[in-house]
Amino acid sequence: MHVTLVEINVKQDKLDEFIEVFRLNHLGSIKEAGNLRFDVLRDENIPTRFYIYEAYVDENAANTHKQTSHYLKCVEQLESLISEPRKKRSFIGVMPEIK
């Protein structure tokens, strides 16, 4: 399992727009064949900070995600909504095991 954790810091006055832009990416992502999870989380202490937890069956599926129209459109639209570049960390999922 290939997991990516993305931190996104949104401009205070762009929160509602961010939610709508990211909702479309979320809805497209959860329909992808290799997607296991695509969670959008909001920091309870910093309301302008979001974390995206993406789990795919393997790195190839994660890379395929980055070529989808919903992902590319989201990345383009995020540029005017975020206060700093996105931060990404990749992980190898150990549990649960994929069978």
UniProtKB/Swiss-Prot annotation:
Primary location recorded for the protein, binned into one broad class: cytoplasm
Gene3D superfamilies noted in UniProt: 3.30.70.100
One Gene Ontology term, aspect cellular component: cytosol
GO terms, molecular function: (4S)-4-hydroxy-5-phosphonooxypentane-2,3-dione isomerase activity; oxidoreductase activity
Places the protein is found: Cytoplasm
SUPFAM superfamilies: Dimeric alpha+beta barrel (SSF54909)
Residue ranges of every copy of the ABM domain listed in the record: 2-91
Domain of life: Bacteria
Annotated EC: 5.3.1.32
Record keywords, A-Z: Cytoplasm, Isomerase
Catalytic activity: (2S)-2-hydroxy-3,4-dioxopentyl phosphate = 3-hydroxy-2,4-dioxopentyl phosphate
Subunit structure, as described in the record: Homodimer.
Family: Belongs to the LsrG family.
Stated role: Involved in the degradation of phospho-AI-2, thereby terminating induction of the lsr operon and closing the AI-2 signaling cycle. Catalyzes the conversion of (4S)-4-hydroxy-5-phosphonooxypentane-2,3-dione (P-DPD) to 3-hydroxy-5-phosphonooxypentane-2,4-dione (P-HPD).
Stored NCBIfam families: PRK10486.1
UniProt-recorded name of the protein: (4S)-4-hydroxy-5-phosphonooxypentane-2,3-dione isomerase
